[in-house]
Amino acid sequence: MTTSDLPAFWTVIPAAGVGSRMRADRPKQYLDLAGRTVIERTLDCFLEHPMLRGLVVCLAEDDPYWPGLDCAASRHVQRAAGGVERADSVLSGLLRLLELGARADDWVLVHDAARPNLTRGDLDRLLEELAEDPVGGLLAVPARDTLKRSDRDGRVSETIDRSVVWLAYTPQMFRLGALHRALADALVAGVAITDEASAMEWAGYAPKLVEGRADNLKITTPEDLLRLQRSFPH
C-alpha cells in the first residue's frame, strides 16, 4: 500500500454556538485567553501537527468575529456553514471535507472550539491508539469523585460505581463515512445527539476510550475561563 492509499487525518471544529452560560458580549470561542481568542488557541494544536491533512471550522452564517482573525486567512483552514445543533454543524463540516477530497475511510477528529488546552501529547496518543482501530474513539478522563444519582426531588437514589464511568472529552475520532451515516441517521430518527461518540453508539458501535489529561477543559462558565488563563503565557 502506498502512502497515498493510507487513510488521511482531518479535523472539524464546530464553532457556531453562542455559549449563553458565559454571559458575555460575544460567543465564548471569541473571548480573550491570554492575548488571543479561545478559538485561535484551540486551532494551534491541530495546525502545528504534521499528520493532519486539513481543518474545517463550522461557523454561523452571520459570524462577525471570524474574518478578523489571522487564522481565517490560513490556507490550511477551510470554512463550512454551522447549523442549529452541534450535529448539524459537524455534518456540514464532513460534507466540506468530501469537497476537499477526503475519502469515506479517512479519519476525522472533531474537537470543541472552546476546548483550547489540548496538548500535543494527548493528540499524539489519540492518533496512535486509534489509527488501526476498527471503530475509533475519543479522549476521556476516568471519573475521580464519588458519583451520586438523584431522584426527582434532588435526593440521592444510589451511588454509582465510578470505576466504570468516564468523562467524555474531545477530540473524538471516527471514519468520515461511518460518522456521516451515524449522524445523519440519528437526526432523521430524532435521536438526541450530544457528541459524535453518542451517534456512533446509537449506530451500534463501541468507541474506544483513550485516557487524556483532565486539564483539557471545555470553557462553559466564566470560572472555566479564569482557570485556563493560568495555563497560557501572557
Curated annotation (Swiss-Prot):
Site (Transition state stabilizer) residue list: 21, 28
Involved pathway(s): Isoprenoid biosynthesis; isopentenyl diphosphate biosynthesis via DXP pathway; isopentenyl diphosphate from 1-deoxy-D-xylulose 5-phosphate: step 2/6
Enzyme Commission no: 2.7.7.60
Site location (Positions MEP for the nucleophilic attack): 162, 218
InterPro entries assigned: IspD, IspD/TarI, IspD/TarI_cytidylyltransf_bact, ISPD_synthase_CS, Nucleotide-diphossugar_trans
Catalytic activity entry: 2-C-methyl-D-erythritol 4-phosphate + CTP + H(+) = 4-CDP-2-C-methyl-D-erythritol + diphosphate
This protein's UniProt keywords: Isoprene biosynthesis, Nucleotidyltransferase, Transferase
GO biological process: isopentenyl diphosphate biosynthetic process, methylerythritol 4-phosphate pathway
UniProt KW Nucleotidyltransferase keyword: yes
Gene Ontology MF terms in the entry: 2-C-methyl-D-erythritol 4-phosphate cytidylyltransferase activity
Cited PANTHER family: 2-C-METHYL-D-ERYTHRITOL 4-PHOSPHATE CYTIDYLYLTRANSFERASE, CHLOROPLASTIC
Family to which the UniProt record says this protein belongs: Belongs to the IspD/TarI cytidylyltransferase family. IspD subfamily.
Role: Catalyzes the formation of 4-diphosphocytidyl-2-C-methyl-D-erythritol from CTP and 2-C-methyl-D-erythritol 4-phosphate (MEP).
Protein name (record): 2-C-methyl-D-erythritol 4-phosphate cytidylyltransferase
Annotated source species: Pseudomonas paraeruginosa (strain DSM 24068 / PA7) (Pseudomonas aeruginosa (strain PA7))
